[in-house]
């Protein structure tokens, strides 16, 4: 239902980054990874925030593209200003990552890559 709301908002308001963020996240948790990545890439081309890079990293990771995920997470760290702020943000998303099939033991390994 939320996904439909964000699609309507995107239709009404062109280049609505807020709608794209909603579509990206709702698509991610709905297992629509290609759609999620499409919207995160649009955001990154326009006005990305640290969370946009991080969420795009999540999508890349669950799609099996570890290298792309690491690059996007690196950009998120830069946008956050500090690794600590990134980690705080990242740890809030551990549950959704686990629900998407990321193994708990792989999380520290990914963070070590960064």
Regions found by a protein language model. Name each.
Residues 80-114:
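Terminal, low-structured helical/coil segments at or just beyond the last alpha-helical repeat
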């Amino acid at each position: 239902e939320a996904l439909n709301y964000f699609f309507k908002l995107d239709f009404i308001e062109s280049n609505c980054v807020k709608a794209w963020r909603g579509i990206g996240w709702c698509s991610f948790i709905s297992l629509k990874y290609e759609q999620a990545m499409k919207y995160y890439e649009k955001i990154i081309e326009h006005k990305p925030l640290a969370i946009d890079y991080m969420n795009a990293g999540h999508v890349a990771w669950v799609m099996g593209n570890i290298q792309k995920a690491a690059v996007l997470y690196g950009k998120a760290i830069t946008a956050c200003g500090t690794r600590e702020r990134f980690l705080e943000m990242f740890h809030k998303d551990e549950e959704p990552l686990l629900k998407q099939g990321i193994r708990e033991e792989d999380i520290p390994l990914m963070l070590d890559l960064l």
